[in-house]
Structures are given as structure tokens and as C-alpha cells.
């Protein structure tokens, strides 16, 4: 178990009333558990579980499962007024055989001899003090979860099987072998049906996890008989970690053995959920409540895989954004497939701070639907962010700032009184913005020269900005920019109306400004950018573009 404690809960009549009506998905899921025990009354302890396959390093999907489950757990605590104990078990399937050598490990050839051996018996290729591949990856999972302060209990399949904690249920699986086969065989092809067994013996000679047919299953003795790899008939007890279950029966067995009440899993498990449930019931358990989430996709729209190492890692996200933004991305639309790559970070950061600033002004019923209530377990901090992350990225781009001090020069002029000391959240974002810009924006920046119409527009904009005093508000600057665009036929949008009743302004005008002046296709509100960067500085940028010094 980790040293982290569950977040403190302060129950008030307002919170209790709002929770009863809350529509946010963690509350909807928590109500399933209440309904589960509506007739019998709630047990002393409710068990939440998440699973982890340590075939590769943990990725954000792994983290997200724990984060989301923790949100449901917290909502459940509120709905039950914290009168029911809860546990969150993070279970690692580290007795599974290594089916292939992962792509993202050093010296792949050195692991080839260990194919089909339990992951906890495969040597650790990463170096350090960890004895096995699984022990290393399990430690990485716990490190990630500890970083975020989750309260959880880590459980290892290897330890549970070998210590005998699953023995009672495994002996029941031998007794009910025929019932399990009746569930499994219809799900298999004809060829596989002939050799399938829910039991996977671990060869006493080679140490490999064997996919072999059973010659005998002895319910009375609690043993299975099979031919080992060398052809010798072998009998093993199903207890003590000598035998494990195939992954589908294993899922249901674990639920029965641990008494799991709630588990979420990815859409790739959805078609098998009924199988897991039935196996759990055959083994004397009650199937838990489920929540099926959509899978994250990489930049190419492919499913993120632990063994491929595609997508983005937890550490990579945290190099460019605060931890809360990552938790927000996991909270949002869990039933929608979302791309998980570096380009989603700036928008997510700004959304987090937008939700955070709104929280204090909201009534309780709206607070419980605000993601920050769930991210911070009902106690979000106060934070005022006078400059958005997207705006900061444009400021770095225009100013070529390489140090936080340069950016703070612009920020403190724009927002007097704000300093790194009195706004540490903003100071952290300054560092993130510089790093993100250098790694992702700068390499793709591409300025273009303006055509004749665009040159005239830029000259008119320069003149208009020259009429405004230093320190002019961003909204006033934005309106001045719009006035320039409305007078140019190319940028008139007749589907929109200006305040005076004339045509509105096409987004192509702002796209032109960003392409010519910043070297990017889009950006935040241009008036806000000018207010932050400075009117004189923006006019100097326009002059550079007109002189051909940017493209």
C-alpha cells in the first residue's frame, strides 16, 4: 500500500444536496455501486480495481484508468457521506508470459530466450536494482502513481498466485472446469476448441507458460495433467503459482477472489465483459460494475500500445504542462476516442485554468460538474492566470525569448504587479511555454511573404496601431484590427454582421496575420497578443514582414 492518504472530505448540506443531483460521469458511475447494494445494504468495504499489463512501461492510458477510478471512488465517498470504507487495488498481470519482445527495450536480442516466460521471470533489461522486467515496470507504475498522490494498493499476480491467495478460487476452477469450458468454447474457432484449456501450466523444466491441452483435470486432487514441452506427461497442483489461468478466465477469477465491486476497462475489452462476468459467477463471485472507456490514439490515429511505445508518455506530458492538465484530459469525454499527442497540450492547459477560474463563482450544482472539483477531490486551489498558455507561446514565438526573464518583462508590463513570486503557477507556465515552443513550434515555423492585398492590409494595420497609445486594452486593439479588416473586400464575411450592420471579418484575415508575422497557421485572439507583446513591438514586426526580413 502507498503512504498516501485519501483526500479529506468536508461534508456540508450544500455539497450533499448538489451531489444527489450531480450529472458528472464519476457520480453516475458511483450511483451504480449504490444501486448494486440497494437491497442488501452497503458492505463494510467497497473494492475498486484497475489492471496493468507490465509488458511495457506504463503509458497515459494506464495512469488514466487509476485517475478516473479515483474520481469515481471520491464521488462514491461523497454520496455515502464517507461512511463506507473503500480500497483501490492496482493489479499487475506480471505472471503472464512474454509473448513478444517489446520494441522499446535495450538489447532486444538478449530477451529472445525468455519468450513465453512469466514477465516476473524475464531479466530486467534496463539495469538498476530491479530483478525482473516486471519488477522494473511495476516500480515505474508505482512511481507514476505516487507522483500524483493516488491512494492505492499495488498487487502482483506473481505474488498472489505463489503465496496461495488465489488457491481457494483456483481449486473451485478445477471443480467447475466443465462449466468454464462451456463459457469459453463457443467463443473460439474450431481448431482452437480442440486444444483449449483455461489452465496454463508453468513448465517445471523450462519455466515457460505453456498453452497445451489438458489430458486430465482432477477436481478431487486439485491437479491438472498435460504433456510438457519435451513430451513427458506431467501432473501439477493448480495451487501455489504452478499454474495460472488464461487471461479471460483470469479476469473473472480475480474479481471473484478479491470481491471487486467496480472496474473500468478500455473498449477493447468490451466484447469479453460478459465472459469475465460469467466466469466470476461460476467461481462464486458477483461480477463488478463496469465502465467502458474509449482508447487513446496516437498522432496517426492508431491505438496506443505499451510495447510499441507510441503516443506520448506521462513524463513527456509533464515536461510541457502541469500535472492537472493531464488529469483534465483524462476526465474529459472518457467515452470518446481522443488523439493523445503533443499538440493537444496547449488547449488542455488553458481549459484547466479556465475551469479553475470559474469554480469560485459557481453554485454548488455547477461546481460538482466542473472538472476541477474532481481533479482536486473537491478542494481546487485558487489561481489567477492573467495570460493564457496559447498567448504565451505566441509571445515566445514573436520575441524569440529563450529565458523566463524576457517573457516576464512583457508580462509584468502588461499586468502590473504580477511577479514570479506572487504567481508561481504563471511562472511555471512560462518555463513550460519556452520548452514547448523550442521543441514543437520552432521546428515547424514557416513564414510567408505577403501578397499585394496583404501588404496593403498590413500597412493599414500599422497605421491604425500607431493611433493607439501604449497600454491600450486588448479588446480596444481587437476592435481596431477588425476595423482595418472590414474595409478590405477580401476579408469581408457577409455571413456575419459588424456592430454597424456592415459585413463581419473573415477568419482568413487573422490566419494571414499569423502566417506572415508569427510563422504559424493560427493563434489566440490577435488583439490580446498585441496588448501583451506591445504596440510598438508589433509595429516593428509588421515593418520586418513588409521589408522581407521574416520570410
Curated annotation (Swiss-Prot):
One of its GO terms (molecular function) is lysine-tRNA ligase activity. ATP binds at residue 306. Its EC number is 6.1.1.6. It is found in: Cytoplasm. It is an enzyme of class 6 (ligase). It catalyses: tRNA(Lys) + L-lysine + ATP = L-lysyl-tRNA(Lys) + AMP + diphosphate. InterPro entries: aa-tRNA-synth_I_codon-bd_sub2, aa-tRNA-synth_I_CS, aa_tRNA-synth_I_cd-bd_sf, Lys-tRNA-ligase, Rossmann-like_a/b/a_fold. It comes from the Bacteria. This is Lysine--tRNA ligase. The gene is lysS.
Amino acid at each position: 500500500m502507498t503512504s498516501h492518504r485519501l483526500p479529506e472530505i468536508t461534508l456540508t448540506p450544500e455539497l450533499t444536496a448538489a451531489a444527489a443531483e450531480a450529472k458528472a460521469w464519476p457520480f453516475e458511475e458511483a450511483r451504480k455501486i449504490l444501486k448494486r447494494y440497494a437491497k442488501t445494504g452497503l458492505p463494510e468495504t467497497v473494492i475498486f480495481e484497475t489492471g496493468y499489463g507490465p509488458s511495457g512501461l506504463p503509458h497515459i492510458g494506464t495512469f488514466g484508468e487509476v485517475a478516473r477510478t479515483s474520481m469515481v471512488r471520491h464521488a462514491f465517498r461523497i454520496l455515502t457521506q464517507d461512511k463506507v470504507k473503500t480500497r483501490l487495488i492496482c493489479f499487475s498481470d506480471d505472471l503472464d508470459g512474454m509473448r513478444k519482445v517489446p520494441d522499446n527495450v535495450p538489447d532486444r536480442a538478449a530477451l529472445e530466450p525468455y519468450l513465453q516466460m512469466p514477465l516476473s521471470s524475464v531479466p530486467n533489461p534496463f539495469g538498476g536494482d530491479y530483478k525482473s522486467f516486471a519488477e522494473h515496470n511495476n516500480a515505474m507504475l508505482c512511481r507514476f502513481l505516487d507522483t500524483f498522490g493516488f491512494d492505492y494498493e499495488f498487487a502482483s499476480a506473481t505474488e498472489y498466485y505463489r503465496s496461495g491467495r488465489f488457491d481457494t478460487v483456483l481449486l473451485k476452477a478445477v471443480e467447475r472446469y466443465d462449466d468454464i469450458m462451456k463459457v469459453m468454447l463457443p467463443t473460439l474457432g474450431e481448431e482452437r476448441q480442440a486444444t483449449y484449456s483455461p489452465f496454463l501450466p508453468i513448465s517445471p523444466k523450462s519455466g515457460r507458460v505453456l498453452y497445451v491441452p489438458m489430458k486430465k483435470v482432477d477436481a478431487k486432487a486439485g491437479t491438472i495433467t498435460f504433456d510438457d514441452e519435451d513430451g513427458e506427461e506431467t501432473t501439477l497442483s493448480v495451487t501455489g503459482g504452478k499454474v495460472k489461468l488464461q487471461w479471460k478466465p483470469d479476469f473473472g477469477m480475480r474479481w471473484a477472489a478479491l470481491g471487486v465491486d467496480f472496474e473500468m476497462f478500455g473498449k477493447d475489452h468490451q466484447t469479453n465483459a460478459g465472459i469475465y462476468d460469467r466466469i466470476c459467477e461460476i467461481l462464486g463471485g458477483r461480477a463488478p460494475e463496469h465502465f467502458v472507456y474509449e482508447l487513446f490514439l496516437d498522432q496517426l490515429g492508431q491505438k496506443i500500445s505499451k510495447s510499441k511505445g507510441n503516443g506520448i508518455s506521462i513524463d513527456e506530458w509533464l515536461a510541457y504542462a502541469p500535472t492537472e492538465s493531464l488529469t483534465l484530459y483524462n476526465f474529459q469525454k472518457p467515452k470518446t476516442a481522443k488523439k493523445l499527442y503533443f499538440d493537444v497540450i496547449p488547449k488542455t492547459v488553458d481549459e484547466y485554468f479556465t475551469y479553475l477560474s470559474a469554480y469560485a463563482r459557481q453554485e454548488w450544482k455547477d461546481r460538482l460538474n466542473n472538472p476541477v472539483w474532481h481533479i482536486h477531490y473537491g478542494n481546487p486551489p485558487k489561481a489567477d492566470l492573467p495570460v493564457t498558455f496559447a498567448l504565451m507561446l505566441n509571445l515566445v514565438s514573436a520575441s524569440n525569448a529563450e529565458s523566463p526573464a524576457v517573457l516576464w518583462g512583457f508580462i509584468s508590463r502588461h499586468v502590473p504587479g504580477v511577479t514570479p513570486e506572487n504567481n508561481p503557477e504563471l511562472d511555471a507556465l512560462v518555463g513550460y511555454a519556452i520548452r514547448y515552443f523550442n521543441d514543437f513550434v520552432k521546428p515547424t515555423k514557416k513564414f510567408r511573404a505577403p501578397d499585394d492585398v496583404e501588404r496593403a492590409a498590413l500597412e493599414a494595420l500599422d497605421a491604425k496601431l500607431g493611433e493607439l497609445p501604449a497600454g491600450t486594452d486588448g479588446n480596444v486593439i481587437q476592435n481596431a484590427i477588425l476595423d482595418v479588416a472590414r474595409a478590405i473586400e477580401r476579408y469581408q464575411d457577409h455571413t456575419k454582421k459588424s456592430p454597424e450592420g456592415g459585413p463581419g471579418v473573415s477568419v482568413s484575415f487573422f490566419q494571414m496575420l499569423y502566417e506572415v508575422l508569427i510563422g504559424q497557421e493560427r493563434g489566440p485572439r490577435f488583439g490580446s497578443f498585441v496588448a501583451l507583446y506591445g504596440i510598438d513591438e508589433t509595429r516593428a514586426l509588421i515593418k520586418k514582414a513588409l521589408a522581407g526580413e521574416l520570410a
